[in-house]
């Protein structure tokens, strides 16, 4: 523990600068010394010597050098008493170290400060010198600044404890005296005195300010009374001024009342005159209606006459077709009867031919039996030839089938190649379309306006800018450039599908601006521009909830926004966006459009492009159209990126189709080569087949010739009859065929004529119905014409008997009012000019009767107020200003004083609180440290400090005291115990104060050897550990003090007898 403490002490000492420590003290003719110089170490210094050797004079000289008064040293009454007997002056010179961070003005004094005080019989002088001994200052303020800088208070017992102060404490058993010692040693006494002094000064200053403020209260009361009088007088003046103004207003109110009547009459005339064009418009409307109905009547009569002629001709034509149809039916019936008769005759001949053939067969069978052997050989040969023909025929058929199969494959290959070519064309067309869209989007990205009309709209906007003075209000457009989407670009394509060309339209405020804008459009070569006329002054429409479709799906109105309310109003009026609903897909859109028949629902648009709506009872669904990039997107970058990706996909599809086309061409060439080869093989097989068939035919002819050579007259006759009958059958069948063709033609003719007759009859029915309908319309037109003529006569009578007479009467009244206004203006101008009335502000619309009543009431009030006051308001104001000037400066000065006193009081309260807290902490610290030092001798103790009672009591318990009684008075201790406890108390105080050096004189008196040894060891350890410079003066032997490099011992010379 000792070693670790020594290491910590050494590290602290290395950081210590030693600034403010005493290097040496020189005295000349001071007390008992003629010339004495003592040098001190920076750490612990012991000075010993016999009584009378002048040890205590060193501390006295140190105190005198730092400005202490003679009584403060308790060694003399005046400073001149310190001059050695027989001398006329005394000099005390102290050299201080001045280096490190805590140095005092090192740039002036250097590393050493010399303080020299010269004392004479009549005066004293203090001089501060630098390290070279050169004089720097002789002012006491400089010395005081030096002392405060290093915190050197030689009157503080913790800095310099003289032998008198030590004895005073040792012999004091009074708790109040001990408290005074502690209070002074810890500088609490000094701070407390300063705070008390400040509080007294503040109290006195506050009382002075209160007294000064009381001196001006009578004047302030008088000022307050004057202020009330002035305020009342000002009100009287104000009433008089208002009375004059009201009189002037009354004069002009008659004029303004006539103006009001003139305005009302003018408005009445305007309204009456507005009835003229309205009435005339109705007359013109009815006149136009009459003329239109007359024209329609003329046309309808001509139409009825024409229809009558056409119906007559149609009846004749219908009768003609009816006769033709009857004739054709009769011809068809006659041909049918003849055809049936011929068919029966042919059938009879065929029956006779079959009987003859049976007879010939019987004869031939008999002949065949005779020539069976020869025929057997011929049949074998024929059979062989037939087999060969069959083989070749099979080969030819197989080759033909293979050829047809490959031809079909080649045909399919051509169709596939044509399909691929069509796909390539479609993909190329799609790619060109996407590239065009990308170029358009890039152009829109540069200028969004071009999305709604291209370059034409740019030219149009430039034309509008050139002609902007011709417009009553600047046109708004194109509408699409003023429309934004609220929640992203999700519904962009659906919104654009719904609004369509309305996005390209422009809005103007009236018809004149519409014509001007049309001229600008022609100038910009923008034909067919859609122009909407709408009142710009109308606020944004507020659509009630019950007027929109009740569905959770959004409407177009809910997903769009605009910086211009007119644009939204136009979209509501023109397109009904509040009734157009958006849906995610086809199924949801179908459920919304056709599910519940929602009220106020106009149309439903889906994300995939379907449009659904009702037209009467019919459900209508329009398929998606070709999708183009949306023009309403906030940013076109994403669309351009998607289209570029789509264009890249189309290019990949084109490349794949080109590769498939090449493969298809190669396959087609192979198939065509195979077809050519098969054709060649088939031609060879057909040649072989022809040869075999000719050979087989020749053999059959030979056999037939042999058979004919046989003598068979009966067979020949029968054959001739059969041939004759067959020829007749062929002749009759040919005739039947011709007859059948004639029958078909007759049937077709009859059917055609019958259909024409039916069609003609149906057409005639329509013509007759049209004729009847035209007659009904003609009657209705005649009735409407009579009604329109009656309405025209009615409005003409209103114009003649009502409108024009009312206007004439109103104009006569207007002229009378003008004359009356002129007279009233002349009378009012004599009272005051109209500009004076205008300067009072805008007219509030008061009538002459109201102003007359106000004037009467104000005259009565003014009369009452004038009776209460005798002084003039100017005199009152002069008195008020005089008194205000008299006390204004004083009041400001007193207020400033009070604010400063309050700030000082707040600061004093804050410092007093800090002082009490520090005093409480010092009390605890003193008890802990005192008990710690006592413990080194095995003694325990406690210090009780009462700031309220100003007492300090010490309790000490000795280790050998078996009774455990606590000694509460130092007089009850032995001399050594009292000296040791005094030392412990002093060390505790030392730890609580800071100073560059400390000095103690005769600290070990009345101590026994053991207490003295313990006290010296504790004192030396504390001094070395504490770090500041220490000076110990004792008359006793200090050989028992341990040797240390930081301990310096000096022996004073013995006194001369």
Swiss-Prot record:
The keyword Thylakoid does not apply. ATP binds at residues 49-56. Residues 818-845 are annotated as: Disordered. One of its GO terms (biological process) is double-strand break repair. Residues 449-632 are annotated as: Flexible hinge. Residues 135-448, 633-904 form a coiled coil. Residues 818-828 have a biased composition (Basic and acidic residues). InterPro entries: P-loop_NTPase, Rad50/SbcC_AAA, SMC_hinge_sf. Keywords: ATP-binding, Chromosome, Coiled coil, DNA damage, DNA recombination, DNA repair, Nucleotide-binding, Nucleus. One of its GO terms (cellular component) is chromosome. It is found in: Nucleus; Chromosome. Residues 22-1047 form the Zinc-hook domain. One of its GO terms (molecular function) is ATP hydrolysis activity. Induction: By methyl methanesulfonate (MMS) treatment. Disruption phenotype: Delayed root growth in seedlings. Hypersensitivity to genotoxic stress such as UV-C, X-rays, methyl methanesulfonate (MMS) and mitomycin C (MMC). Forms a heterodimer with SMC5. The SMC5-SMC6 complex is composed of the SMC5 and SMC6 heterodimer attached via their hinge domain and from the non-SMC subunit NSE4A or NSE4B. Core component of the SMC5-SMC6 complex that promotes sister chromatid alignment after DNA damage and facilitates double-stranded DNA breaks (DSBs) repair via homologous recombination between sister chromatids. The flexible hinge domain, which separates the large intramolecular coiled coil regions, allows the heterotypic interaction with the corresponding domain of SMC6, forming a V-shaped heterodimer. Belongs to the SMC family. SMC6 subfamily. This is Structural maintenance of chromosomes protein 6B. It comes from Arabidopsis thaliana. The lineage of its organism: Eukaryota, Viridiplantae, Streptophyta, Embryophyta, Tracheophyta.
